[in-house]
Design a protein with these regions (language model features):
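Core catalytic region of metal-dependent phosphoesterases/phosphodiesterases
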Residues: 5, 10-83
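Active-site-proximal beta-strand elements of phosphoester/diester hydrolases
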Residues: 1-9, 126-133
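Hydrophobic positions in the central parallel beta-sheet of the AAA+
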Residues: 3, 30-32, 128, 159-160
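Acidic, His/Gly-enriched loop-helix segments that form or flank divalent-metal centers
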Residues: 82-173
Length: 173
């Protein structure tokens, strides 16, 4: 079976319960469509689980991008404050106070190699996986939000997205 999940945001216990609920096995494949980290304390453990599990594939979300902008080789101006305001403090603490420099570098290297979208075919059906919003530019794919009236821009392709809370689309809280 093929599964997709996004916006786990450090909720390792809920993620593990999900894996148990779906009876995730070596015959399955799970796509984590970004935002495994931040807000809750166990995001780095989720990254390690994905890194160590051959049948899990992760895409870059805006929270991983903020982490890279802050801790990556370019150390973008203002990135740390933006990341902190968006719940990055827990991930920052975990990477710097609970991981060795070697492990931290492995994790950052993993994040730097993540794609921002992925096209897959399941039983003849095309799927476009993206954290933010389907689009031509990287920022849209990572940061964009879909709207209820949006349709797939790709013919015969179903888009599976994260980032935008479902209640924003349905109006149901």
């Amino acid at each position: 079976m093929i599964y997709c999940v996004s916006d786990i945001h450090g909720e390792l216990d809920k993620f593990e319960r999900l894996l148990t609920l779906i009876q995730f096995s070596e015959n399955d494949h799970l796509y984590v469509i970004g935002d495994a980290i931040d807000r809750c304390a166990m995001g780095v453990d989720i990254l390690r689980l994905v890194m160590d599990t051959s049948n899990m594939t992760m895409l870059l979300g805006n929270h991983e991008q903020m982490c890279l902008a802050t801790l990556g080789p370019h150390n973008e101006f203002g990135a740390r404050e933006l990341w902190r305001r968006n719940g990055g403090s827990s991930t920052y603490r975990e990477l710097f106070y609970h991981r060795t420099p070697h492990e931290r570098n492995m994790i950052l290297h993993f994040l730097a190699g993540l794609p921002d979208h992925l096209d897959i075919t399941v039983d003849g059906q095309q799927f476009h996986l993206v954290h933010g919003c389907p689009g031509a530019d990287r920022d849209t794919r990572i940061w964009g939000r879909i709207k209820p009236e949006d349709r797939s821009p790709y013919p015969d392709t179903i888009c599976i997205v994260g980032h935008t809370p479902v209640n924003f689309l349905t109006g149901v809280s």
